[in-house]
């Protein structure tokens, strides 16, 4: 059932729980508000896809267990949910995609997420979460997209990680992460790594195991030293942003044929397009304290 983008208002009707055979329900982009009815969480046990995005739903997210044992995709982003991430989500063992981003969720990221072994995509960006990123998230065998940007997460990035599981997209921008970037952070499958606007320090690591990285965003940290020449060997890279760090030295000559992509069309505002479609083909190098050299098409902006 698709009821998206209508003018529905008021609370979600408790009668939703009577639709025991429904498998797909999308009521996004309406004006429903209030909390999820308990009858709804206990009914609808055939649901496979549930989309409740862009509404005004509030209170806690799944504070208790539901009967959504078959659900594969759950989208509850862009609401007004508050409190901790509910333990009711822990029972959704079939989940492949969970999006609870753009809410007012607080507390820490639960360690039990690693029990959702079929989870491919976990999006919790733009909330009020704090504490460290659980190391268990990086060891999940199926997780390919992990989005934790724009929270108040702190602490060091995990060091003792081997390969970072199946991760392809890791988004951690706009947090309070500190320490050095581990050499092991970029597993062999990583395509997008976004660590912008944290408090990371030390040198840019060599990223020895990287094969497929397309987008590497390290802007707005406290990185020092020079650009590692090993980046020259990463031929798949499309976008590199090292702006607003404390780098020095010269730009490797291997970048002489790169063209500047930073700022064209406002890439920061449209980064979701890059991540989704990988359409950008420009290498962005924009930072201070580097030798301003003429190298083919490469432009350096302060």
Swiss-Prot record:
The keyword Repeat applies. Gene3D superfamilies: Ribonuclease Inhibitor. Disulfide bonds: none annotated. LRR repeats lie at residues 1-19, 20-43, 45-70, 72-91, 92-115, 116-140, 142-164, 166-188, 190-211, 213-234, 235-258. The keyword Repeat applies. InterPro entries: Leu-rich_rpt (IPR001611), LRR_dom_sf (IPR032675), RLP_Defense_Trigger (IPR051502). Keywords: Leucine-rich repeat, Receptor, Repeat. Coiled coil: none annotated. It holds the Pfam family LRR_1. Belongs to the RLP family. This is Putative receptor-like protein 16. The lineage of its organism: Eukaryota, Viridiplantae, Streptophyta, Embryophyta, Tracheophyta.
